[in-house]
Curated annotation (Swiss-Prot):
Coiled coil: none annotated. It holds the Pfam family UPF0060. It comes from Enterobacter sp. (strain 638). HAMAP family: UPF0060. It is a multi-pass membrane protein. The chain crosses the membrane at residues 6-26, 29-49, 61-81, 85-105. Belongs to the UPF0060 family. Keywords: Cell inner membrane, Cell membrane, Membrane, Transmembrane, Transmembrane helix. It is found in: Cell inner membrane. InterPro entries: UPF0060. This is UPF0060 membrane protein Ent638_1931. The keyword Cell inner membrane applies. GO terms for cellular component: plasma membrane.
Amino acid sequence: MIKTTLLFFATALCEIIGCFLPWLWLKRGASVFLLLPAGIALALFVWLLTLHPAASGRVYAAYGGVYVCTALLWLRVVDGVKLSAYDWAGALVALCGMLIIVAGWGRT
């Protein structure tokens, strides 16, 4: 389960980077050349999703919980926003949901 969780975090990081770089270009006037690493990050994101040993719908559902946690870490580290108690509670609920889904992968 730890390997799966780490793979989800890597997947989420690729998705966030792949979306953040075009955001920098569109909102902050950064170089258009950021679209190239953004495209690479998004392609890596898609490839990483294929490495999970479950049906795609289950993978996407479980991945959503980890994405929430990763996005909140990004909010704290990159955007410099202090997380609220609601952020932490939401992350905990999302992560618990992911763990429940992943725990059932081999049982169905």
